UniProtKB/Swiss-Prot annotation:
Organism: Simian immunodeficiency virus agm.vervet (isolate AGM155)
Key word DNA-binding present: no
Disulfide-linked positions: none
Function: Plays a role in nuclear translocation of the viral pre-integration complex (PIC), thus is required for the virus to infect non-dividing cells. Targets specific host proteins for degradation by the 26S proteasome. Acts by associating with the cellular CUL4A-DDB1 E3 ligase complex through direct interaction with host VPRPB/DCAF-1. This change in the E3 ligase substrate specificity results in the degradation of host SAMHD1. In turn, SAMHD1 depletion allows viral replication in host myeloid cells by preventing SAMHD1-mediated hydrolysis of intracellular dNTPs necessary for reverse transcription.
Start and end residues of each stretch annotated as Disordered: 98-119
Name of the protein this chain belongs to: Protein Vpx
Note: The 155 isolate is from a monkey imported from Kenya.
Length: 119
């Protein structure tokens, strides 16, 4: 410590670590939500993903949060669900079929809001 400097390295800022300045946050988030939806619809089915999306949107509206923050919450929830699903041992060999979503011939209607990548 002869030079008077702290020998520990300084912590880099968030943008230095992730370098998000090169791509707008909204565009990055939209791409990530579409990618995770492409994987999630093979394992969970669209109806469940619609319900999670609508939950995030309605909860965010109640709390006055921006749309990007609501989409990020959806992304985190689906990512955690996929992690647990794979951790428990996914045995699915085929993509999720629409008829599997309907129990005893009863299926829900399509909700008003659809997450990106599930159109």
């Amino acid at each position: 410590m002869a030079s008077g400097r702290d020998p520990r390295e300084e912590r880099p800022g968030g943008l230095e670590i992730w370098d998000l300045s090169r791509e707008p946050w909204d565009e990055w988030l939209r791409d990530m939500v579409e990618e995770i939806n492409n994987e999630a619809k093979l394992h969970f089915g669209r109806e469940l993903l619609y319900q999670v999306w609508n939950y995030c949107q309605e909860e965010g509206e109640r709390q006055g949060r921006p749309i990007a923050e609501r989409a990020y919450k959806y992304y985190r929830l689906v990512q955690k669900a996929l992690f647990v699903h794979f951790r428990c041992g996914c045995r699915r060999r085929q993509p999720f079929e629409p008829y599997e979503e309907r129990r005893n011939g009863q299926g829900g209607g399509r909700p008003g809001r659809v997450p990106p990548g599930l159109d």
